[in-house]
């Protein structure tokens, strides 16, 4: 399963990539934050999930989430330092499938990724 990491902090990007690859996911990093939703939607094969930071240079994670949900049903997990409950509520209402604050606990993050992916697979199986 392919997971896209949209994170501006190089240390966190590296940590996430290593964590995901150790859990046998394919991890792809986006480092250019211009037309990010379009970059993600044009990936072949399409990603199975996006880990999305909220605070990015040039483009907000909130805007990226909104654009992605207009054009795809790729699940999104916000992974952000924004701890305000209104930010979390806004993220979920705009289409994010989960909202995790930094610093994150790696086993909990992997568990929540697994839950979102299972829910998505189950939902897609029902459509078939």
Describe each PLM feature range.
Residues 1-122:
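N-terminal/domain-start alpha-helical segments
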Residues 123-127:
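Short alpha-helical interdomain "coupling" segment at the junction between an upstream regulatory sensor module
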